[in-house]
């Protein structure tokens, strides 16, 4: 929306005037309701919509913003929104959780490519929330459970971005 672009151009200009390095965060849990009504991150079409959106951001802000975070804390909004039900859309579903993980992981790559296409020298990344995971009392069953938790909590989004697959 042009008013939103104008607003953020003013914010970026003010940051630069004050010698503050602006950073662009493409997605920070703010799904438009019209897209959520179509399934949000559970809908594969979200990848096309996200590509178009990030392209608009890169074209409009890339001349002034060189640092971009494609997605902020993907585990928080996928787990919280699609599995635990504590963040929008507030559902509890393994199917929705896993499809959202897959689409968000792909969106990180798609968003990075969209930025790179318009801002070749951009610094591009994603903000991950991680946690230490240990097996209680080093018991085999606890160590096995800790390993599974580590995959979900720490590796699920990071390893694909690093080219290590799922």
Where are these regions (language model features)?
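Non-catalytic scaffold segments within catalytic domains of secreted glycoside hydrolases
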Residues: 1-166
């Amino acid at each position: 929306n042009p008013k939103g672009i104008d607003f953020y151009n003013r914010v970026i200009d003010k940051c630069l005037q004050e010698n503050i390095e602006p950073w662009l965060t493409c997605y920070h849990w703010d799904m438009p309701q019209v897209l959520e009504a179509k399934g949000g991150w559970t809908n594969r079409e979200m990848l096309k919509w996200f590509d178009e959106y990030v392209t608009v951001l890169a074209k409009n802000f890339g001349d002034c913003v060189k640092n971009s975070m494609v997605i902020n804390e993907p585990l928080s909004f996928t787990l919280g929104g699609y599995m635990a039900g504590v963040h929008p859309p507030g559902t509890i579903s393994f199917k929705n959780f896993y499809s959202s993980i897959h689409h968000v992981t792909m969106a990180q790559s798609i968003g990075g490519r969209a930025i790179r296409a318009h801002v070749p020298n951009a610094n591009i990344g994603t903000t991950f929330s991680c946690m230490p995971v240990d097996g209680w009392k080093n018991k085999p069953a606890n160590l096995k459970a800790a390993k599974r938790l580590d995959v979900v909590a720490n590796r699920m989004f990071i390893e694909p971005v690093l080219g290590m697959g799922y």
